[in-house]
UniProtKB/Swiss-Prot annotation:
The organism of origin for this protein: Cellvibrio japonicus (strain Ueda107)
Name of protein: Fructose-1,6-bisphosphatase class 1
Catalytic activity as recorded in UniProt: beta-D-fructose 1,6-bisphosphate + H2O = beta-D-fructose 6-phosphate + phosphate
GO CC, one annotated term: cytosol
Gene name of the encoded protein: fbp
SUPFAM superfamilies in the cross-refs: Carbohydrate phosphatase (SSF56655)
Annotated signal peptide: none
Amino acid sequence: MQRLVPTLRRDGVNPELIPVIRTLLAATKEIAFRVRQGALSGVLGSTLDENIQGETQKQLDVIANQLIKDLLLEEPQVRAIASEEEDTVVAGNPKGAYTVAFDPLDGSSNIDINGQIGTIFTIYPARDDVPADSEAQFQQPGHQQVCAGYVLYGPSTILVMTTGGPTRGYTLDATHGSYLLTQAQLSVPLNTQEFALNMANQRFWSAPFQRYVQDLLLGETGPRAKRFNMRWNAAMVGDVHRVLTRGGIFMYPSDNRNPRQPAKLRLLYEANPMAMLTENAGGKAWSENQRILNIQPDSLHQRVAVILGSANEVDVCMSYLLE
């Protein structure tokens, strides 16, 4: 099996980018070990603190964030980092070529129940026209990402990543500590009969989106004339991994629970990297009225609606929303 770095070199990845990726993934190997140890390593439970999102931090949230942050800030090619757990941009080497944003532990509500969790990350070229610690470093549309990926901590530790070409899958060889190429190219089927959605929010959705979901639930007796199954992990990283490996549509639409915050998922370090992975695997990724990768960010922790997955099903969903 091919190791990670030779694969990156074969893909023509910029030599300055490779050490950034390696440094980031070194942190995920340590996180994977802590996750496997669970209660034995004292990482379960919550802290008394909240992050910038107003969410109670889990102990492993804090540990994962610190591991990734510390390693990246030692990497000379990293000019700045942004994290779900950090209020502001953290400056690195002012001469670094790249900026890195990440959700250190997606699905952290699953930690204490031994459910699916993961790390989502994205890498952008650094901007020379703004200071290293400026939010403007990260105010770039998603199509300017040079690398996007996630690590899923499950029965095996899996890395899914793209550097602009195919979306590839790697598996961590725990014996030697290396990520090995196990899926040369993930391909999302055009059609699907599975959807991932938190149905508990149904009463808060727009009328067009509710009609779309209702037609899914009607199955063979409705206008779709086929049966759909629902899957929901309460972790974007797990639900999107299913979509990338066997098809489906993942949806986290806007809702009216809180008019000041109609969307849930963060554009920079959740929606954009997952959109790039999905598109490079042949799927589509939209935010109700536009392609996710075309959105011009206006704030560091900006939230957007997300609809991604099998291309034909995303088109059907969008036809309801844009009618």
